[in-house]
Amino acid sequence: MRAKKSLVIAAVALPLAAALVVTLALTSKHGSTEPRAFCWGQLSRRDLGQLSTGKGGGYSAEDEPRAYYSGYQKRKFPLCNISQGGAWMAEISVRPSLHNSPWGSDGLDRRAVYESAAPMPHGITGWTGIPHKPQWPSAQLLLPEACREPFRTGDSDVQLRVILRNRQEERWSDTSTRERMTHIATKVGDHLTRKYKCGDENWQKKGQGATPTSKFEHVDPANVCRLRDLKVFTEPEAAEQVRQRTAGTIEDTWSCVTVLDKRLQEQTSTDTGATLAAFTTTRNPHHLTEFKEAHGSSTSGKGFTARIVRCGSREYLLNAKYPVPDKSDAGKFGEKNLLDGETLYADFERAFKQRAQCAG
């Protein structure tokens, strides 16, 4: 009887010991039972470390779905909130498109966004933004059109967003922040397209590194936006009051924005009251198709002119944006010191074709 009782105790003890070994194996060096994978099992502790401005672990994540209305129907979309040490650190979400792509049709008349936006590398319809305080850095990309059906978004694209809930500049550089956000967005994007069988983009491979971006710099009045012979000002002296910022690659997806220097020095939030002329190019097929369906080969409006331009075998969407005369600082400065909108666009197209070595 005693021997039988010993066998029972041993049988119970062995699974408990095994469970203890597993628990210890999963325990981090900080002594916690922190998970090894987060956000639908796609992100590692190392991945989350790329989003953090703190040190150590203590990560947790909740990946409950969030409800949005798609048409008249209430739908649930993936959402993951990430915390470190109990403090909210980042959010990864999927939802119907916000129609806010800086290089898409919905961005034709927007200028201020280019103070912080930069396109993701070639082959990805997405962008990163690191705006002025108090806003947060973000990365956003559009999933392939085939993903509309499984997500049931109708005619709207499916948009993936990564938003960081803390400032990065004290630990990470601008370029590093964009690279790290792109890494997370493309990793989750690849997972979603595989899971829902709506694309095989291999974004993570395409998204290594970041597109070139510059800090705000002085303007050469004879070569604005680093484009040879692009002139924006009625008098060269006006350039002394202006700074410019470029992002991306002009032969692919690119932008340049000019801003009143005094407003930059005030460190105000991004707003159209400070933004002067902005110029963009893209050969992204998604944006070209979207533009053609909405506008044909060209369109213009209050403060912008946009056209499809052929360069050899490639097509580009070019857009020149400019302030209209009003009581804002940009409106008053532009009326006095900037060339008219028609001339700005014509000079920009000419300078682009020269830079891209377009035939004809």
Give the positions of each predicted feature:
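Hydrophobic membrane-insertion alpha-helices, especially the h-region
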Residues: R2-T27
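Extracytoplasmic low-complexity, Pro/Thr/Ser/Ala/Gly-rich segments
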Residues: A25-G107, D200-L260, E335-L339, Y345-G360
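Detector for methionine-enriched segments
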Residues: M1, M89, M120, L141-L142, ...
